[in-house]
Regions:
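Cleavable N-terminal signal peptides
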Residues: 9, 19-20
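Flexible, surface-exposed loop/linker segments and immediately adjacent secondary-structure boundaries
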Residues: 22-159, 163-177, 182-221
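Short aromatic/hydrophobic contact patches that present stacked aromatics
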Residues: 66, 143, 227-229, 267-269
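Short beta-strand micro-motifs in enzyme catalytic cores
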Residues: 99, 151, 226, 264-268
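Short glycine-/aliphatic-rich beta-strand segments at the starts of folded cytosolic domains
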Residues: 220-230
């Protein structure tokens, strides 16, 4: 593998598709593997990455993603999920941030949360589509999931309007109400009506866990100071091979030349980890890919 391939790897390591001064959406945390696709290019999702309209996010097994929108709302994704940022725009209205967004969750579980401060200091107009169902959000906390046989939207707090294709919208204004839209072959099943019910606290706890980043899983966080050195080698080709494998599997690896010219080596790193414990947990997760146990560092 030639030097220009190492240069290309370094560009990917430091670049993030390009950045804007005030990101409308940013990756706060990611429990890899996860990817983002933009303009036909698919690459690993990294903590701190700024997102744009038309980006498509996907997660793998045992993966989680936490996004923060410009006005303070959070979007969480569970494992084996797919979400497109169909519309994403912001503007300042006096001292308030006004966010307009359309999110399309075509697979997996998600959660949308607006905290008290964000409600007071901003406004939002967000539509979330869950395959066959659209929920209109103005400031709330909800959980949803697109499964093979049904789409679910659960109101945790606030108020939302939920609508299945070509049907009248249904207003949910009671905490813990949820809406189920049966599907058949990935399409609305008109032979079965939508259902409304109230979720139990126990079930809600189970649902919420599907989108939460848990401690000890090796998740990266924006601003994390720790790193995992997943591999190190004096052989540039060997290091690049590990780098390529990690990125193909959805891990945001970077490659760095270290040492003097006489004793040059190449480290493959995954950064933005919040603690030594998370770096060590990630080392265990990626060992089957790298073939060796990495080491934590700062």
């Amino acid at each position: 593998m030639q030097i220009r391939n190492l240069v290309a790897a370094l560009v990917l390591s430091f670049g993030a598709f390009g950045a804007c001064a005030a990101p409308t959406a940013v990756v706060e945390g990611v429990q890899m593997p996860a990817w983002v696709e933009r303009g036909g290019l698919k690459r690993p999702l990294a903590a701190g990455m700024e997102l744009e309209a038309a980006d498509r996010i996907s997660t793998g097994a045992n993966s989680r993603v936490l996004l923060r929108l410009a006005e303070g709302s959070q979007v969480k994704l569970g494992e084996n999920a797919q979400m497109s940022l169909d519309r994403l725009a912001q503007r300042q209205d006096g001292r308030q941030t006004f966010l307009q967004a359309a999110l399309d969750v075509s697979r997996g579980a998600f959660r949308f949360t607006t905290d008290v401060k964000a409600k007071l200091l901003s406004r939002r107009e967000v539509d979330i589509r869950v395959t066959t169902v659209t929920a209109g959000i103005r400031g709330t906390d909800l959980w949803g999931k697109s499964a093979d046989d049904r789409d679910i939207v659960c109101l945790i707090e606030g108020r939302i309007a939920v609508q299945r294709e070509a049907e009248q919208p249904v207003n949910l204004d009671q905490a813990l109400q949820f809406y189920i839209a049966p599907k058949a072959g990935g399409r609305p099943d008109a032979s079965r009506p939508v259902q409304l019910a109230t979720v139990t606290p126990e079930q809600l706890t189970q649902w919420a866990a599907e989108t939460e980043i848990a401690a000890g899983q090796g998740a990266a966080r924006r601003g994390g100071k720790w790193k995992l050195v997943a591999a190190a080698s004096p052989d540039q080709n060997a290091a690049l091979a590990v780098y390529d494998r990690l990125r193909a599997e959805g891990y945001a690896a970077s490659i760095f030349p270290v040492g003097s010219a006489e004793k040059r080596a190449y480290e493959v790193r995954i950064g933005s980890l919040p603690s030594k414990a998370e770096a060590e947990a990630l080392a265990i997760r990626v060992e089957p890919i790298t073939g060796s146990r990495g080491r934590a560092g700062t």
